Amino acid sequence: LIAVQTQGYAEIDPRALNAQDIAGPEYAPAFSLSRQDASYLKELLCPEDPAVSHPSSVAVELNASSWVERNRPAYNITGYLPGTAASEGDDRMILLSAHYDSYFDGFQDDNCAVSMTFGIIKALIDSGYQPRYTIAVCALAAEEWGVCDSKFDWSTGAWNQVFRVHPEWQGRVIADLNFELPAHAHNTQDAIRSTYESADFLKHFCENITVPKEAYPDGLTVLAPIETWSDDFSIAISGIPSTVNDFSAGPFMETHYHSQYDNEEFYQEAVYRFHHELYTRLLVTLDQLTLPPLDFSRHFLAMKSSVADCLAAQSNAPAEVLEEIPALLESISKVCESADLLYEKIQEINNHTVSADFPIVSGLSSKLLHIFRKMQD
């Protein structure tokens, strides 16, 4: 199989190669060819002028060694900055994550992200800041792909980390800050992408952030929900509220992404510095909270909107189905009201307007994360 990417990816240069996860039989030789080389071979074999003689085949030399092997080990690399609350029996954590497997140089995707987790932790240590919660830093393997005989072959390292290697993180990690391609501005406006439940907290957090114009002229916003592109999705479905710096909408995905042109020549220092500062500040803000700031009403509102859209699109549905829809919408509205009241209580505790003992807080935090997990299920 010879793959030539004509558009959509690797558009930066005719010499660009593009690599993606394999979806095909393991015995089939497969490789990527640049548009430039493909055009040359096509002209040799199929000249535009039919009067020009051409060979029936062309001999080429391929110098490559790349094998897909089953059941090979991969390694997630984890470190910890202990929190002061651990000595009091509070084992809650905040997670910083990025993947270290990459195609070609993988400068933006995702080596800059791994180094940013180091930079954030170094800043905390150098400043003398002592976190309340233990900070876990995880460099993840097998994000690009890693499962044979499956359509769901990417973000494998993250899934294994939270479901198999450290399932006890579920109920303990109050937030995951995941990073992807963080040293490049993918749009004129930056965005933190999160699960529905964290969006309100993040919007209030962003109100106090000054965004440098040289990095993002149109400022900063919050998007929800997360997408399946990156490891924050695998982590979120385990019951850990997750965020990622938004990266999927910009032209970089069509030009440099997964090609040999994702290298240090395409680097924006102002963007990288801002992301260091933004997510360090977010980490410290989360570290000072008593409870995970989860507003479940956002998820139910999205559900209500989805049900209404389905109802509008299926006017020919059976009568018994249509009759049940109003009751369902009413039930969702009542749940939203309860979720609003719960979030108000969470905010009161986090703003220290009401006090709560540690055993009560710890149990409530665990229950909130349990509800979050059920929402993902």
Where are the regions a protein language model picked out?
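Soluble metallo-hydrolase cores and metallopeptidase-like ectodomains found primarily
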Residues: 19-108, 118-129
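Second-shell loop/turn segments in exported
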Residues: 26-31, 64-67, 100-110, 147-151, ...
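Mature extracellular/periplasmic domains of secretome proteins
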Residues: 1, 15-22, 158-168, 192-203, ...
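Acidic, Ser/Thr-rich low-complexity intrinsically disordered segments
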Residues: 294-376
